[in-house]
Amino acid sequence: VTSYTLSDVVPLKDVVPEWVRIGFSATPGAEYAAHEVLSWSFHSELSGTSSKQ
């Protein structure tokens, strides 16, 4: 069994709207394969506030 790790930091604030849903998809082509997400993390920060007066 071969194991692979994928890790990346992606600044999404400039490319996605305020509310999003995240999903995973993978395929080896025409053959069957099982994929497992062994860990997942997500971090979000509020970078500022606005108030209307």
Curated annotation (Swiss-Prot):
Similarity section? Belongs to the leguminous lectin family.
Residues that span the membrane, as ranges: none
Complexes and interactors: Heterodimer of an alpha and a beta chain.
Biological role: This lectin specifically binds mannose and glucose.
What InterPro entries would the database entry show? ConA-like_dom_sf, Lectin_LegA_CS, Legume_lectin_dom
Per the UniProt record, the source organism is Vicia cracca
The UniProt GO MF terms for this protein read: D-mannose binding
Judging by the UniProt lineage, the source's domain of life is: Eukaryota
Coiled-coil regions listed: none
Keyword tags:
Lectin, Mannose-binding
Q: What is this protein called?
A: Mannose/glucose-specific lectin alpha chain
* Keyword Coiled coil annotated: no
Residues of the signal peptide:
none
